[in-house]
Amino acid sequence: RDRLRSRGLGDVYKRQGDLYVIESTSPVGTTEAMARIIFGERPELESKIFIAYCPERVLPGNVIYELVHNDRVIGGLNPESTEKAIAFYSQFVQGTLHKTNCRTAEMCKLTENSSRDVQIAFANELSLICDKAGINVWELINLANKHPRVNILQPGCGVGGHCIAVDPYFITADFPAESKLISDARDINNYKSFWCAEKVK
């Protein structure tokens, strides 16, 4: 808190009616925490500025297209902030803008990447089992996916990219007792990298 306060968050105010949006992946409660710091330093700003959270949903290398065409989840500090953010994003986003509150929007981003992590962990764990059982995991997954309601991902050496390997920790750190599956998935995917390295040796 002191470190954030030293950066003068209250000084971000320019004029009444300004909108401030957080897009970075953040723990649940970040938007509210930032608002408390700002209004703690500058109480006269309360109800005069708008604060919202809208997680980015873009793929590197295709940023402009996805920025325009992807659906967005927008959650304000209050209903007025949500509407203000909707009005801003509607100027350039052609996808659907889904309204919610800031805590749900924050959790939505963490859920998206944690869901991918869990799905990848299942495929990776399956590959470990198949290695022990003498079964071709690629053939197995291909056959299992013939079922109309089964869609197993392909196993690999953990997970790719930066976000998926990091974002689940925002959930497990704040809700350790309730996030055992998410935590186990992280362990499996981390272990798979070392397992693959040993196989190469």
Residue ranges and their predicted role:
Residues 24, 75-78, 112, 116, ...:
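Hydrophobic alpha-helical scaffolding
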Residues 36-54, 58-150, 178:
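Internal alpha-helical scaffold of NAD(P)-dependent oxidoreductase catalytic cores
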Residues 32-33, 166:
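Generic recognition of short, well-ordered alpha-helical segments
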Residues 15-19, 46-47:
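A short helix->loop->beta-strand "cap" motif at the edges of active sites that frequently abuts
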Residues 17-32:
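Conserved Rossmann-fold NAD(P)-dependent oxidoreductase catalytic core, especially the SDR/UDP-sugar
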Residues 83, 120, 131-201:
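NAD(P)-dependent Rossmann-like dehydrogenase/reductase catalytic/cofactor-binding core
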Residues 21, 51-52, 182:
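Structural detector of well-ordered beta-strand residues that form the stable sheet scaffold
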Residues 1-13:
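Single conserved hydrophobic/aromatic residue that forms the stacking wall/gate
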